[in-house]
Amino acid sequence: ESSAASDVYKRQYEYTQDKHILEEAKKFTNSLEFLSQIPAYDHDLGFLVFCSYGNGYRLTKDPAYKKVILDTADSLATLFNPVVGTMLSWPREVEPRNWPHNTIMDNMINLEMLFWAAKNGGNPYLYDVAVSHADKTMKCQFRPDYTSYHVAVYDTITGNLIKGVTHQGYADSTMWARGQAWAIYGYTVVYRETKDPKYLDFAQKVTDVYLERLPEDKVPYWDFSAPGIPDAPRDASAAAVVASALLELSTYLPNGTGKRYKDAAIEMLASLNSDSYQSGKSKPSFLLHSVGHWPAHSEIDASIIYADYYYIEALLRLKRLQEGKNVIK
């Protein structure tokens, strides 16, 4: 949570320019430096370090932050299996679940750090790792209708897909809301970094199937096939991730399509800004009603800090768009 807290503080500083907020952010950020100095233990290195140190470097240009990012990117890349073509997400699940090489959709979020490192003094190989991971995931981790599996399990000898399953979703055959959100955000970033039109096309396909199935207020149920709909819990974190992604994606597309995505993002934010999803003074968080891990009975209908992070990011992106600025600062 130190990473997400650091990230939220930095986003608040970005809006307020209050130096006290930046100092609080630095305290949380510095507590994560050790992650750049130890062997990679799972895929979350990218999210933990790039959101904290990446935003920190963007705002301060502190060279110490840059070194941490570059070292962590090298560490993350050690999880890459060239036979499979993706990074291993959860080494801890290899033996207990008999998942020889597992890649989760969340891992798409970590590619941004690899792209950044490759063009900011890191090993150019990191770019190739990110592209390979995106390509293999695109080929193997989606159904014909462009809904995603949470987990792809691969054979380490042949590199072939063994099966697609869920871990945090309702069932292997269903669309877990935040997993699809990671895909939308991830492929938007891959297009930004490569300018390869196949990723732009794919980002739209995974977005459209998500948008088509949303309830009226544009905040998804935690899984699109969750039991108990319409009374099933919503996932505000997924809505925040998608809103932020669509504000960027909209800028890469012609007016009609781009406006449709931008308008959808604005509707999502309008719902998240409403009393139905705002915590007010009841909690230290901004947003209520996220779901972390339903099958594990963890963080159900809860406030989750990364929901706040992407919510604030989306609000800042919308502000920049309204001011006629580049959505990516």
What residue spans do the PLM features occupy?
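Structural helix-adjacent loops and short alpha-helical linkers that scaffold large soluble proteins
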Residues: 12-26, 57-70, 118-131, 191-204, ...
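Carbohydrate-binding/catalytic loop surfaces
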Residues: 47-62, 88-105, 146-175, 218-241, ...
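CBM-like carbohydrate-recognition segments
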Residues: 64-67, 231-329
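Oxyanion-binding "anion nests"
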Residues: 179-215
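Single conserved hydrophobic/aromatic residue that forms the stacking wall/gate
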Residues: 1-5, 9
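Long, well-ordered core segments of solenoidal/helical folds
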Residues: 20-40, 69-89, 129-149, 155-166, ...
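Aromatic- and glycine-enriched pocket-lining scaffold segments that form the walls
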Residues: 86-151
